[in-house]
A protein has these predicted regions:
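The feature captures the short pre-catalytic strand/loop hairpin that immediately precedes
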Residues: 354-372
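Amphipathic alpha-helical substructures
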Residues: 328-333, 375-462
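Long, His/Glu/Asp-enriched segments that create or flank divalent metal/ion-associated functional microenvironments
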Residues: 239, 451-479
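Juxtacatalytic substrate-recognition/specificity segment
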Residues: 145, 178-181, 199-305, 316
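Extracytoplasmic/secreted proteins, especially bacterial periplasmic and envelope-associated proteins
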Residues: 144, 230-241, 284-288, 307-315, ...
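Zinc-dependent metallopeptidase catalytic helix centered on the HExxH motif
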Residues: 138, 272-349
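Extended, low-hydrophobicity, Ser/Thr/Pro/Gly-biased non-transmembrane segments
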Residues: 23-80, 87-197
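Second-shell loop/turn segments in exported
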Residues: 75-81, 219-230, 274, 302-303, ...
Length: 479
């Protein structure tokens, strides 16, 4: 710390707000669980200290509830006190073999090994499996990357490529090495740090002042690489399209890396979207590119807010299909095309609103780790809610909300209350009754778990022109 040796150790995490801190002697303060409170085999009334790391996707969700969290929190103690408000530098030198993290649903994330290197996709917490960091989404430092790897290998990271330096043979690299330097001036959330190494082809081009990188593992077949490139070439156009709603693209670069490992998911790594399994698809590119605004530039303040950014990224997929309908009907400048765009969104909402079964049974703002990235509560339900909000506010005001949020919270994080306050500000009818109705809308769509079935067991406030009771109409009319 500040150039002086420091003590360090690894401790178990404790539940948020524990008055006894990280050294709480009560074992119940360090238990894992899918639910809050833990309520494990000893009926623990405390919140969980970590999510259980299920060994595979076949293991029951609650199998590890009530077990002890691992001692994986690095605690550094400086040799001298640090003054309030002062700047200090912590340097951590470490060695190890990067790996993967088992999540609360049994899937894995982290540094996936490939025959020629590694491929990084780490949502929500697996950056800790290859580097020490404050592993929480609202912690957003800037990054400089300097990776020395075997000669002939390529390093793909966030931001812009600063330099590539060839090095002579050494004891560590008998065949020579190459040092890749990348720089991100923009802050990056903990789970969005990219640092893949391998036999990647790397190209770049600049469109509208943004440098777009494209990287593919060279072991991907020629025909698939060509198909991938055709979709990657769409990224500048997709960025321009999504900018109509969100405002200017928030970074100086963008890009896509396509690796070969078949991992659990593709991911919106900041400025360098990661696609797995050797392939890319257009729907997902619209989704992940939307994340550059939502999740990347404006990050959720905690994991319970995952629905906020995944819902907006799902909305981008709805916008994509509405765009296709618009083009087929005459294009964005024709009345027929514009009508087709709006009709596509209405149809998408109505289809989702008819959902039954377990679609409505988990509140988006209160997910379990087991279903965080696999349930309708994270993707389709908030995506439908945003369509309804667009109908309630009108397309123009809806876009103004998105752009205001980017200006206000860009580079930082956002809470649910802050998100909802912005929509309240742009509600066309500012009466007390309409403001109260919008508050009820958010409670129903974001914060309520309904019994199984749908029908009467689903939100009872929708929007103008949509299935359901609407917003400015009975019951509970506002004016």
């Amino acid at each position: 710390v500040n150039g002086h040796p420091a003590q360090f150790g690894f401790v178990q995490p404790t539940y948020p707000g524990d008055p006894n801190g990280q050294d709480d002697p009560n074992p119940a303060a360090h238990e894992a669980s899918q639910v809050n409170p833990v309520d494990g085999p000893d009926n623990n009334p405390l919140p969980p200290a970590c999510s259980p790391a299920l060994p595979d996707t076949k293991t029951p969700a609650d199998a590890l509830d009530g077990t002890q969290c691992p001692a994986n929190k690095l605690v550094i103690t400086p040799s001298a006190p640090i003054g309030d408000g002062s700047t200090f530098v912590v340097t951590v030198r470490y060695t190890g073999r990067p790996g993967v993290h088992n999540d609360g649903d049994g899937t894995t994330e982290g540094w996936f090994r490939a025959p020629d290197g590694g491929f990084v996709t780490t949502e929500p917490v697996a950056s800790e499996d290859w580097m020490p960091l404050n592993d929480y989404p609202a912690a957003k430092p800037t990054y400089d990357f300097s990776d020395s790897v075997n000669a002939g290998k390529t390093v793909i990271a966030n931001g812009v490529l600063v330099s590539v330096r060839q090095n002579p043979a050494s004891q560590e690299f008998p065949g020579g090495s190459v040092t890749w330097n990348w720089h991100s001036a923009a802050p990056i959330a903990s789970y969005l740090v990219e640092d893949s190494v391998g036999n990647y082809s790397l190209t770049s081009r600049t469109v509208d002042g943004i440098t777009f990188y494209q990287a593919q593992d060279t072991s991907i077949g020629a025909a698939q690489q060509q198909a991938n490139a055709a979709i990657m070439d769409m990224q500048p156009d997709i960025t321009a399209f999504e900018s109509q709603f969100n405002g200017p693209y928030p970074f100086v670069s963008g890009g896509v890396i396509i690796g070969t490992p078949s991992v659990s998911f593709d991911e919106e790594m900041q400025t360098m979207i990661a696609f797995s399994g050797g392939a890319i698809d257009t729907d997902t590119l619209y989704h992940e590119n939307m994340h550059q605004w939502w999740g990347d530039n404006v990050t959720e303040d905690d994991y319970h807010m995952t629905f906020y950014k995944e819902g907006l990224a799902t909305l981008a997929e709805f916008f994509y299909h509405a765009r296709l309908a618009e083009d087929a009907a005459g294009g964005p400048s024709s009345p027929q095309g514009q009508a087709a765009f709006e009709a596509s969104l209405v149809d998408q909402f109505n289809k989702l609103y008819r959902s039954s079964g377990s679609f409505w049974t988990t509140a988006p703002s209160n997910p379990e780790p087991f279903s965080l990235f696999s349930g309708s509560n994270t993707y389709d339900r908030p995506g439908a809610a945003y369509i309804a909000l667009r109908q309630i506010l009108g397309p123009g005001n809806f876009d103004r909300v998105l752009q205001q949020l980017q200006r206000t919270y860009g580079g930082g994080s956002i809470s649910e209350a802050q998100l909802e306050a912005a929509f309240h500000q742009w509600l066309p009818v500012q009466s007390d009754s309409c403001q109260e109705r919008l508050s009820q809308f958010f409670t129903q769509w974001f914060d309520t778990a309904y019994p199984t079935g749908g029908g009467a067991h689903r939100p009872m406030i929708t929007g103008p022109g949509l299935d359901g009771p609407g917003f400015y109409s009975a019951p509970g009319v506002c004016a």
